[in-house]
Curated annotation (Swiss-Prot):
Present with 1350 molecules/cell in log phase SD medium. This is Altered inheritance of mitochondria protein 46, mitochondrial. InterPro entries: Chalcone_isomerase, Chalcone_isomerase_3-sand, Chalcone_isomerase_sf. Its main location: mitochondrion.
Amino acid sequence: MRLISKVLVKTNCLEVGMRRAPQWYSHYSTTAGNARVNKKGSKVVPVLTGLALASIFAKKWYDDSQIKKADATSVAVDASISAFPKKMGPPQWPFSTQYELIGKGVRCVSSITFKAYGLGIYVAAEDKHLVSEVLDSKFLSQAFIDTAAPPSPENSHQDNLRAALNDPAKAPILINNLLDSGIRLMSKNTPIKAGSFKLLMDGTKKSVLKNPDSQSQDKDRLEAGFQELHDCFRSVKGLVARDDDFFIELNKDCSMNLSYYARKKDEFVILGTVKEPLIGKLLFAHYLAAVDPPSPEARKEVIDALVSLS
């Protein structure tokens, strides 16, 4: 089992790997050589071991006693992983802003019976107003939402919005307009089964390509974006433990900040940024508008949240 060799920290204006601690969390910092820093500021000596030794650590690797149960500030997603915080942001978490959970569920791979990840979708608290500004706009209401002629007195705008967000033809249009508004979102992917960083990278790429709109995009831009995604994972290799977290922050310009939290070691790793906006937009549109989304449960809860915010 090979573990992460270093923690790379940056602020919004820094490139990954520069040795400067972010102002919003002063005890996150890089250190000389291959040492790492945990959330408590303690120096951690890197440990290297072979994949063949993974079974020796199986008991600790799957220690259920470390799983955090739901409380007033969190919600349960699956019994095998820690509850998801309702709010995440500085100073406890080194993200760009404060986020609030709007949807959660289990993400299945290959078979509906194989639970791979817990998926949480968060919205920036400062950007919640954009939901009503976009989805209540006169143009979208008349063209895609409140389209019944004559208008039905039995259905409110919220009823019509819910129906439109569940419509395979209308949902992508509405969600893409919302993403174009500059709304900031974040996904939290928590493995239910131990995996690898390669699986995280490949799964992210596959989710982008599953969006039908990816077929009509500029192939050179897509490939450049996928190369940026690949570059983000150059600094990490090996296994990803159950109950660790992989975060994807969608910025206003649809670029993405990628990061990873090793729960048992209490370490936060800045993986890098995918600057190509096509990748971020296609990925989050797939999360929120796909006919076959990664987590139907999470998408349903997101729709409920968007309707309540409109």
